């Protein structure tokens, strides 16, 4: 126990530059990277802070085409400007994003259009 206390005392006496050099030496000796652990540990906190703010950009996601697939394809074409084949592939490959990075009002409007055509839509 006395040895551990001596190590703690020695580490506490290090300057910031000495501590950084010690970290580099330990990374080389043990073959690890402290930067990766810091990035992983910081990520959950950043996500929680972003979730607390009100979302301003939305992605309109086509969850399912429903019974009126042709009507949904027409709406997807009108919204996205895609060709017939691309719109058909998007509808048949649901769930897929139809439009990304739109504001709340536009997202709600697009959702209503697609639901009126018979699609099941999610906003993310």
UniProtKB/Swiss-Prot annotation:
UniProt GO cellular component terms: cytosolic large ribosomal subunit
GO MF, any single term: mRNA binding
Segments forming a coiled coil: none
Keyword Ribosomal protein: yes
InterPro entries associated with the record: Ribosomal_bL12, Ribosomal_bL12_C, Ribosomal_bL12_C/ClpS-like, Ribosomal_bL12_oligo, Ribosomal_bL12_oligo_N_sf
Protein family membership: Belongs to the bacterial ribosomal protein bL12 family.
Reported function: Forms part of the ribosomal stalk which helps the ribosome interact with GTP-bound translation factors. Is thus essential for accurate translation.
Descriptive protein name: Large ribosomal subunit protein bL12
Gene name of this polypeptide: rplL
